[in-house]
Every structure is written in C-alpha cells, then in structure tokens.
Curated annotation (Swiss-Prot):
This is Pentatricopeptide repeat-containing protein At5g39710. The keyword Lyase does not apply. The gene is EMB2745. Keywords: Repeat. PANTHER family: PENTATRICOPEPTIDE REPEAT-CONTAINING PROTEIN 3, MITOCHONDRIAL. PPR repeats lie at residues 133-167, 168-203, 204-238, 239-273, 274-308, 309-343, 344-378, 379-413, 414-448, 449-483, 484-518, 519-553, 554-588, 604-638, 639-673.
C-alpha cells in the first residue's frame, strides 16, 4: 500500500499541476464518493490538470474511474491527455467495451496524420504513469480501423514499433479486417500481412480467415486456397468460419460443386457444418436456379437438427421467386410465418416482384399491406417494382397512386421508376404521355438513359410510327446517349413489320459498323422478314450467320424458319431444323420445352407431329401430351401417325391406362395401328395382367385386317417369344376360328 501511494505521488510530480489543481481534484473526489450531485458546481472551473491529477490518484478504483468518466466526458477539461490516461486505466481493468467507445471518440476527431501522432504521443507520455501494457495500442488501432481510418491505424502501429512498443496480432487483424471491409485493393492487405510477418507477429486463425475472406471477395479463390493450405503448416487449424468463407467464395464464382466438396470434407477435420454453412450453400444453389438440389440440403440440415432461420427462408423465397415457382415461394412464406419468423424487406420485395411478373397485382398489393402491418417500410425498389407491375399491365392510375405514396414516404423516383412509367404509356399506346414523362424526368434533374429512349422508340415502332422512332434515335444521339443493341433491334423489327426490309437491312449494317453485336431478336426479325418475302435462302443464311457468331437461336427463330420451310413444301428441312431443338448443343439451354409447346400454334402440322415424336423419344410424355392436346385445341386433328407415336411412347413410359385410352380413341377415329405399336401395346397389357384389354386388342387387330397376314403372324410370334406364354394367344385363336376369322398365314 505504501509503495502504491509513493508511485502515485511520483507520477503526480511529473505534471506541472498547481496546488489549486490538486485541491480541485481532491474536492471532485470527495463529491464523487459522497455527493456526486454537487459535481456540477465544479464544472466551470475544473481544469485538464485537475482531471489528470484525479485520474492518477484514483487509478486503482474502478468504480470511481467510471463515475468520473461519466461526469467528465462531455466537458472541455476532459482533453486528449485525460482521455489517454483513462484509456490506460480502463484497459488495465479490462473494461474493453467502455475503453473502445472512448477510443473511437478519440479516433473520430483525427482529421490528419499530425493529430494521430499527437494521440500516440499522449499515450506514450502517460504510459508509465498508469503502468500500462501494449494492449492499449491494440485498442486504439482497432478503434481507428473500425472507423475505416486505415492509414491512421497503421501510423499508430508504426509509431508504437518505432518507440519500442509491440502492437500484436490484434492490431494487424484490425487493420486487415478494415482493409477488406472497405473494399480496398487486396494488394494493400497483402502488404500489411507481409509487414506483420516481418515484424515477427505470428498470424492466428482470425488473420487467415480475414485474408481468405478478402481474396474470396476479390474473386481470387486460388490464393485463398493457398492460404488455407498454409494455415495448418503454421499451426493454425481452420475452423468453421474458414470453411464457410471458402464455400461462399466458390458459390459466388458459380463453382457450387467445389463448395459442396469442401462442405463434405469438413468432417475429415472433425468439424461439423453449422447453419451458416448450409445457408451459404443454399444461397449459391438458389442464385444458380438449382432449386431441386436445395431439397437435399434441407433434408441434411433437418437430419443434423438444424431449423431454418430467417436467412434460410428469405433465401429460399427469393430463389423460388427467381425460378418462377411462385407456389413454392408462397408455401415457404406461410411456413416462415408459422414459425414466428419475420420476412425481410428484400423477401417481400421478391414476392411482390413475382406477383407482378405473374400479373397478379392484387396479391402484390396484399404483400405490401403485410409489410406495413409488420412494421416494415417498403424501399425504393419495392415501390419501383409495383410501379413497373401496374405499368406492364397498362394500369396507369394505380401506377401513379403507388408513385405518390413513394414520394410521400420520402423516396425519390429513380430513372428506373420513370422508365417503368414510360413503358406503361407505350404499352397502352399513349405515346404523348410517354414523351411527357420523359420531359418530366429532365425537369426533375434526372437524365434519361438509353433504356428511356429505347422504350419510347420501341413504343413508336409498336404504333407503326417508325419515322418518329427514327427521330427519337437522332435525339438520343444528339444528347450523347449511344443507341444499344435493343435500340437497333426495336427499329429493325419496326421496319420489318412494315415490310420495309431494305431500311431494316441498312440499320443492321449500321449496327455492325458501330460495333454493336446483333442479338437473337435482331436476327429473328430479319429472318422473319425474309421468310415473309419468300426468300428462304437469305433467311437460312442469316440463321447460319447467327450460329457462327455464337448467337443462339431461340424458339421463335426456329418457329419462323420451320413455318417458312413448310410453306415452301421443304418439309424434310423443317423436320431437321426441329430436331435441333432436341439434340444439338447449339440450341440455348433457356429454350424451355414449355415455351416450345406454347409456340405449337405457330408451327405447321407436320412439324408438330415431329415435335411429339421428339418428346416421346426422350420419354417426356407430359410435354408430348401437352402438344397432342394443343393440336386438338387448334383444330388440328391428330392423324394415325400421331396416335401411333403417342401410344408407343406411353407404353414405353409404363402408362398403360393412357396408352389404352388413346388406342380406343384411335380405333373410334378409324386410324390404322402400326405393327410396332400393336406389339408394344400387347406386351404392355400382358405385363400388367390386363387380360380383357389384351383380348380386345388382339381380336380387333386380327378381325380388322389392318395388318397383313405376315404382320399378324409377327404380332402373335412376338407375344409368344417375348412373354413365353401362348395361353392367351391360343384362346383368342380359338374364338376367331369359331367365327371364321382365323388368319390364313397361321395354322
């Protein structure tokens, strides 16, 4: 006790404090201990020297220091030196949270390197007075780093090292973390890490995790993996955070399978994936549209005892919305609410976007109301999504009502919002209103972009006013806005629709001259124009050109070409082209069979039959059924070929009931069964034990004389050979013999 008092007296002697300062300090101490409400009487005359005196006298009394800090902090006498003394004391007591707040207050006042040097000097001068440790420098460096004052943080590190102090791994980790968070160039972090090693500071698992996160964020997964491998050789075992960071890095690079492998390898290191691990993988799968695989991950999560949290549900809902699976998104939303979890603004915006995309604006508004009830504020994107949804349907009154609410809630419409309104007016054919919105944008200080002008231009093209569309193109060029591929494609399509193919071709040539690559819409418009003119050679030439240039034809392109070929009785070429939709890699993956089916009304009858055959060969009977039914809906009566293909397809797929139903329809319509179809149907019925149906088919075939004697014999032999059972055949033959219908070729 005597030694402590002696040291304090010695410390106080280093300050040039007057007796009056000492008296003030003693008086404040008395008030702090007994009458804290009297302290305000001292505030006006209290000096920085008195404050320093008080702090040093009471540096071993934690409660007293905290009381003084609470009183002194807002006052001017609590200077930088006083704050540095307080930081030393708080750190010594390990009151890191309170110390952090004070240190960040000091850091926030640092405007230049000179002040940072002053901070260090004050810490250095008061260091011995408080018997401090180097951890105080770690604390200050961390505070500068948390405020993203990275250069100032490093200057404190360098000053400390130059004066014999040893900032440790915490200081370097703080600087590295701030560097990554501020998205500074990753090379800066590499240099800091190199400096850290040169300073003999050993990295820990947090250091490596920070660096791995930085390299993953920069898209340099290879360097991140090198660090991952180096960790263990340096005695740092990767933890779950390390793995999660790398898995996320893989997912962001669309290397989800590599991410999965890493997830599986965690068990080899004795680590178990946590909820974040699974959420990262689910997010990667959702972004890639691999929603079927998500169910396997969810099953594994459930097996390991993890419940879905808000992040999981929000990710799943967004993923299902992106996929267009609105039903499953709504199921997830309902399940989320049942578990007492709150969807985020992003989740609701995704649901609203999905409903708008589906044209269900009533449901979209219901979700907006739900947001309000749950205390969530729609953001600019939410409102813009609704404005776009109403505009797409031409409900402009509702779109403007949402716009007013958007303004009332403090959100200024963006260029994207105005573009949605412009599009709405173009959809409804009110081009004057579209131009008015364009002018309104300019008045509000927003510059129309290429989308704004292209939308107006496209609107004029749809209104068959291509000359006005050309004027808009000239205006945008004068304003310094370069037309893009969409601009030219809209104009080309507009001219093609008016049979002004020469001008469309001139625009195409101009497009190439300015270095804009044509897309599938550009090519399809021109191909359609040539097909309409009967110039199939030029149309096919353009088709070949687009494939050579890596522009993948879509289903509309193929529909146009197939129709053109069929109209000129070039059926074989039409069929060959149609088969590309099934077997050639040059066909884009986003040409969905659903889209193809929807375009059946635009494809000639013979090609539709080929389409059915393609689906049956692939075992895609649901799609084949849809095409078959679409034929009936379009007054295209299926012929015998279509029925034979469908019956055979369903037999192969194992749907005997459907095959037999089609067989009865076919017989009723008077079409002939092919030998292969009969054999397939008989085999399938026999396999399923459908004796009555089997008898019916055989009797019909043999009595109808649809097949030749050789074909009839082939059917019967096939049954015996394949099934090893002649009982049914003999029964049928006996019945036919009675009626005099025994085939001549069978004895």
């Amino acid at each position: 006790m005597f030694l402590t008092k002696t040291l304090i007296r010695r410390s106080l002697s280093t300050f040039a404090s007057s007796p009056s300062d000492s008296l003030l300090a003693d008086k404040a101490l008395t008030f702090l201990k007994r009458h804290p409400y009297q302290l305000h009487h001292l505030s006006a005359n209290f000096t920085p020297e008195a404050a320093s005196n008080l702090l040093l006298k009471s540096q071993n009394d934690q409660a007293l220091i905290l009381k003084f800090l609470n009183w002194a902090n807002p006052h001017q006498f609590f200077t930088l030196r006083c704050k540095c003394i307080t930081l030393h004391i708080l750190t010594k007591f390990k009151l890191y949270k309170t110390a952090q707040i004070l240190a960040e207050d000091v850091a926030a006042k640092t405007l230049d390197d000179e002040y940072a040097s002053l901070v260090f000097k004050s810490l250095q001068e008061t260091y011995d007075l408080c018997y401090s440790t180097s951890s105080v420098f770690d604390l200050v460096v961390k505070s500068y780093s948390r405020l993203s004052l990275i250069d100032k943080a490093l200057s404190i590190v360098h000053l400390a090292q130059a004066h014999g102090f040893m900032p440790g791994v915490l200081s370097y980790n703080a600087v590295l973390d701030a560097t990554i968070r501020s998205k500074r160039n990753i090379s800066f972090a590499e240099n800091v890490f190199k400096e850290m090693l040169e300073s003999q500071v050993s990295p820990n698992v947090f250091t490596y995790n920070i660096l791995i996160r930085g390299f993953c964020f920069a898209g340099n997964i290879d360097v991140a993996l090198t660090l991952f491998d180096k960790m263990e050789t340096k005695g740092c075992l990767p933890n779950v955070v390390t793995y999660n960071t790398l898995i996320d890095g893989y997912c962001k690079l669309r290397k989800i399978d590599d991410g999965f492998k890493l997830l599986r390898s965690m068990a080899l290191k004795g680590l178990e994936p946590n909820l974040i691990s699974y959420n990262v993988v689910i997010n990667g799968l959702c972004r890639e549209g691999r929603m079927k695989e998500v169910s396997f991950v969810l099953t594994e999560m459930n097996r390991r005892g993890y419940s879905l949290d808000e992040v999981t549900y929000n990710t799943l809902i967004k993923g299902y919305c992106k996929e267009g699976n609105f039903h499953q998104a709504l199921v997830m939303h309902a399940e989320m609410l049942r578990h007492g979890l709150t969807p985020s603004v992003i989740t609701y915006t995704s649901l609203i976007h999905s409903m708008c995309k589906a044209g269900n604006m009533n449901r979209a508004m219901e979700f907006l109301d739900q947001m309000r009830v749950r205390g969530l504020c729609p953001n600019e994107r939410t409102y813009t999504t609704l404005v776009d949804g109403f505009s797409q349907k031409g409900y402009m009154n509702e779109a403007y009502r949402v716009l007013r609410e958007m303004n009332d809630n403090g959100f200024s419409p963006s260029v994207v919002t105005y573009n949605a309104l412009i599009n709405g007016h173009c959809v409804t054919g009110k081009m004057e209103d579209a131009i008015a919105v364009l002018e309104d944008m300019k008045e509000k200080g927003l510059s129309p972009d290429v989308v704004s002008y292209s939308t107006v231009l496209s609107g004029f093209c749809r209104s068959y006013d291509v000359d006005e569309a050309l004027r808009v193109k000239r205006e945008m060029v004068e304003k310094g806005i370069k037309p893009d591929t969409i601009t030219y494609s809209s104009l080309i399509q507009g001219f093609c629709e008016q049979r002004r193919t020469k001008e469309a071709c001139d625009l195409y040539e101009e497009m190439l001259r300015v270095g804009l690559p044509p897309d599938e819409f550009t090519y399809t418009a021109l191909i359609n124009a040539y097909c309409m003119e009967g110039d199939l050679e030029k149309a096919l030439q353009l088709h070949n050109e687009m494939v050579e240039k890596g522009v993948l034809p879509d289903v509309v392109t193929y529909s146009v070409l197939i129709n053109g070929l069929n109209k000129q009785s070039r059926t074989r070429e039409a069929k060959r082209l149609l088969l590309k939709l099934f077997y050639e890699e040059s066909v884009p993956s986003d040409v969905t069979y659903h889209t193809l089916i929807e375009n059946c009304s635009n494809i000639e009858f013979k090609s539709v039959v080929s389409l059915i055959k393609g689906f049956c060969m692939k075992g895609m009977m649901t799609e084949a059924d849809q095409v078959f039914e679409s034929m009936l809906g379009k007054n295209h009566k299926p012929d015998g070929t279509a029925y034979n293909i469908m019956i055979h397809g369903h037999c192969r797929a194992g749907d005997i009931r459907k095959a037999y139903t089609l067989y009865k329809e076919m017989v009723k319509s008077g079409f002939l069964l092919h030998t292969v179809t009969v054999i397939a149907l008989v085999k399938a019925l026999h396999k399923e034990g459908k004796v009555n149906e089997l008898n019916s088919v055989i009797v019909h075939v043999l009595r109808s004389c649809e097949l030749s004697e050789a074909e009839q014999a082939k059917v019967l032999v096939e049954i015996n050979h394949r099934e090893g059972n002649m009982d049914v055949v003999l029964d049928v033959l006996a019945e036919m013999a009675k009626d005099g219908f025994l085939p001549n070729g069978i004895s």
